Amino acid sequence: MTAKFVVRGGNRLSGTVTIGGAKNSALPIVTAAALAAEGESILENVPDNSDIQHLCEILRALGCRVERVAETTLRIQARELEHHVAPYHLARRLRGSTYVMGLLLARLGKGEVACPGGCEIGARPVDFHLKGFRALGAEVVVEHGAMVSRRVDLRGGRFYVDRASVGTTVNMIITASLAPGVTVLENAACEPEIVDLANFINAMGGRVRGAGTNTVRIEGVDRLRGARHEIIPDRIEAGTYMMMTAAAGGDVVVENVIPEHLGTVIAKLVEAGQEVEEHGDCIRVRARPIRAVDVETQVYPGFPTDLQSPWVALMGLADGISVVHETIFENRFGFTNELIRMGAKIKVDRNTGIIRGVKRYTGAPVEARDIRGGAALVTAALAAEGVTEVSGVQYIDRGYTRMEEKLAALGADIRRVPNGSEQ
């Protein structure tokens, strides 16, 4: 049954929130665990959000054994991976389904995977991935909404990653890990999640060098074996709770983080007038009056596109006018129509939002249509006067584990209720 959040705004947040494992690391790493034809992998700090659940279902359907042996621990054994067609009804629900294609090409030399579904934030074309597969000797075409392999003769190659795409970089590392010869990726993404993936593959016996730089070198090996690995903390989840604290007001410690992964976000929050302190693996945010600050999303280490939406919600309460320019995805301002229902003053011109701050938001029924836009609506709801009902919670669940429980523990008045129920 679909659900909604009912949020009564106005409560200040206080306490400590623990950040889970990075979804954007877990998706490729859980997929890469199935590259191992020997042994089993134990993955720790794995978030239990719906995207990870869907991926585990896909791997089971392909013949892998996947068990959640503890709240944040997965055991994966892929010796019996033998099916090359990912079930359509599962793959279409997952943006990371393209990684499964790379896995199948590497392990089985053939594959058929539905083109990715997920959030309504514009096109995420598979063309970059298809070009990468072609550079490694695999001809993959799109037919009837699915990626289908035709001729596959995997071998190392040199490939330029358009727009420093994170997804394409991930997929090329996965595919090239078992491809004979050496693969060189130029203009590769540098995100911490790329480094995390490379560390795991190397622990399995792979040979990935240069992760975290623009040039990544992968020397293919004959076989990989299972390994133990702890996934890095989710910098996007951490940044979201930091912005929620600034918007709602309060004093919150965000724990289990790597502060250097959030350098740009911390700098922008400080520029916006917030008090931010780093203590080991914790970041403390004390809310202060919000100043308007311009932001342009960029690849890492720039301001993350996945935090653009919560930032817009925060800037909607700032003193002054701010400009937010989105350079990674088109159509990522769709959520602003819902913020406007809550009293925000935002004008969008293609990939730029101009935000004139207001003193407060007012509660209203709103609908989330993507993960981060949903987080932005909750951010606004926490700071709003009155009650806000946020439907489309299934999108939020794709990227955040038990958000309502974590916020309630900080003092927020937030409940998850079935859609259609009377309040």
Swiss-Prot record:
Modified residues (2-(S-cysteinyl)pyruvic acid O-phosphothioketal): C119
Gene3D superfamilies: Enolpyruvate transferase domain (3.65.10.10)
CDD domains hit by this protein: UdpNAET (cd01555)
Catalytic activities: phosphoenolpyruvate + UDP-N-acetyl-alpha-D-glucosamine = UDP-N-acetyl-3-O-(1-carboxyvinyl)-alpha-D-glucosamine + phosphate
First-level EC class: transferase
Active site annotation, chain numbering: C119 (proton donor)
A GO BP entry: peptidoglycan biosynthetic process
Keywords: Cell cycle, Cell division, Cell shape, Cell wall biogenesis/degradation, Cytoplasm, Peptidoglycan synthesis, Pyruvate, Transferase
Binding-site residues for phosphoenolpyruvate, renumbered to this chain: K23, N24
NCBIfam families: murA, PRK09369.1
Similarity section: Belongs to the EPSP synthase family. MurA subfamily.
Name of the protein: UDP-N-acetylglucosamine 1-carboxyvinyltransferase 2
Species annotation: Symbiobacterium thermophilum (strain DSM 24528 / JCM 14929 / IAM 14863 / T)
